A protein has these predicted regions:
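Alpha-helical substrate-recognition element adjacent to the catalytic core
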Residues: 1-98
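A short acidic, often aromatic-flanked loop/helix-cap motif at beta-alpha or helix-coil junctions
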Residues: 93-101, 148-154
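A generic "structured core" feature
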Residues: 41-44, 96-100, 107, 113, ...
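Single-residue recognition of alpha-helix boundary sites
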Residues: 17-21, 115, 137-138
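Short, aromatic/basic amphipathic alpha-helical patches
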Residues: 75-83, 111, 133-140
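Short loop/turn motifs at secondary-structure junctions
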Residues: 84-85, 118-120
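Short, basic/hydrophobic alpha-helical segments
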Residues: 47-57, 105-117
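Acidic, Mg2+-coordinating phosphoryl-transfer loop and its flanking beta/alpha structural elements
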Residues: 119-154
Length: 154
């Protein structure tokens, strides 16, 4: 199985510093101004435990697909929360200002024809319905947040 996790609003609570745009996405320009201290104040959401369990499971490949432009502080946060061990981290380049849906489609689509990916079951966790819908069209199972409890560890 390949389990793909968004970060903000999915495994991380960054609501203390999020400014939302008209489409429900993060205001990217404002987001990039956050300090290390602000980033390290993000906290984990319940799905983070399932993500850690997936990272520990040798039969599961874990990917992170985030709209964040990851800085050293972001990687330190992932380390602090025990979720940095993902097999692949897809993050936004500094000059990439695309809306979240086309950005994530572009990041993911190129990986789907890899021999190690093609025939595997794929699940995508994202808090945004428009992103889940787009990923479902690419062949992912995309549970809505109200069903994430089924994936939490006991």
């Amino acid at each position: 199985m390949i389990a793909v996790f968004d970060l903000d609003g999915t495994v991380l609570d960054s609501s203390h510093r999020a400014l939302i745009n008209e489409q429900g996405g993060i205001n990217i320009e404002e987001w990039r101004t956050h300090t290390r201290e602000q980033i390290l104040n993000d906290s984990e959401l319940p799905l983070a435990q399932y993500m850690r369990d997936c990272i520990k499971n040798p039969s599961v490949r874990v990917w992170i697909c985030t709209s964040r432009n990851l800085s050293r502080a972001d990687y330190d946060l992932l380390d602090n929360l025990g979720i940095r061990g993902a097999d692949l981290i897809l993050s936004r380049d500094r000059n990439d200002n695309r809306e979240d849906v086309p950005y994530k489609i572009a990041k993911i689509r190129g990986k789907l024809n890899l021999p190690s990916v093609r025939k595997r079951e794929r699940v995508f966790f994202d808090d945004r319905a428009d992103i889940r819908h787009a990923m479902a069209r690419l062949g992912f199972v995309c549970p809505a947040p109200q069903f994430w409890g089924l994936y939490h560890s006991a």
